[in-house]
């Protein structure tokens, strides 16, 4: 090889190296928001890193925190279980799209009671969180559980202390099934809880329930399973006792009108074996991306997750979105997420 050829080869190698470094840096992304989807987002990120080398750092700080950070443009994407209203999206220049479907369950710590051995209905759950049902052997509970030996002990209520999309989903359900809750408390990421110990994040609530006998708390299903917590059955909209599962979360989404809006409320939906506290969870991105490479990289990551993350999604007890909805999302990316010149990033 001549000196000129060696020099040319070295220049090409350096150029390729610099190009690779630039591409790698462009795909290092940060996201923050709900703890509800954190298990699946973090596993997707690990698998994506293995497949592509790209680094995706997701922090489960709560949905309210995720919304604040994407509005402040301190993260590349935010995450929230509570969909933002259209006027708030427009005001802040944001676009939202769903990723997976999950379920909120009632985790309990009652000596001798295993998962699925206790059944509750919406009115009773609401009355527990209103502080009206105070004992585990209250008639409201025992009539739903004939033959189940329940202790004459206080119910220790656990709820979220932080702004939470999981709380939004849970209180949306309670507002539908308990008229007193609807009129006195309502729904939201944060509400004026009448009773209860506050835990930060799904993991904080799970930790309280795990160590506090007689407790009940609401958590995303994966957190109950990962922490070995017992969870209840719930009566669905048809009055049938249903267990939480990836399938029952999917059933809750069957009646959703996705073509009308991505922001579908899946709580207390009619349908055979539909879990009453099911929900989609959402990603928030800036509609106009100042950094086009990062904006495109966010969409590339979630596109990869839709194509390749289904097995992971289901293994962590979330349900995948219907294929038709994913295609609607991809079409929406083309018209809603652009660079500063107006060029589509997908």
Regions found by a protein language model. Give the residues of each.
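Flexible loop/hinge segments at secondary-structure junctions
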Residues: 25-346
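Bacterial N-terminal signal peptides that target proteins for export
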Residues: 1-11
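Bacterial N-terminal signal peptides
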Residues: 11-22
